[in-house]
Amino acid sequence: GDLPPNIAELFDQFVERKDLLTEAERNILRYYIYGHEISEIPDLAFISMSTVRKHNRSIYEKLGVASRDELMLYIDLLRRCGRLQELF
């Protein structure tokens, strides 16, 4: 069925905020969407772990989440609702 309006609004706001991300931050987000762990990203993206952490902080701030766990929760819920493609 349909999502409760307040939950749908949270998802809408989260998805809209993705437009605030830089291309590099979007790439990091994609790695998370595809199920990669933070420890894998430096090798995949050819960047240092400190750069990944810097991007993470910026991603969390721009998307309005407090942690990677919260980010992954949004990703999982969007996947379950069939809305994950909206993050691309």
What kind of feature is each model-predicted range?
Residues 32-36, 75:
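Short helix-to-turn junction characteristic of helix-turn-helix DNA-binding domains
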Residues 25-32, 71:
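Short alpha-helical "packing" element that flanks the helix-turn-helix/winged-helix DNA-binding module
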Residues 2-27, 84:
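Regulatory hinge/linker segments at domain boundaries
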Residues 1-3, 31-32, 44:
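N-terminal start-of-chain detector that recognizes signal peptides
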Residues 35-70:
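Recognition helix of helix-turn-helix DNA-binding domains
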Residues 11-14, 34, 46, 88:
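Phenylalanine-focused residue identity feature
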Residues 5-6, 41, 79:
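N-terminal functional modules and adjacent low-complexity/disordered segments of proteins
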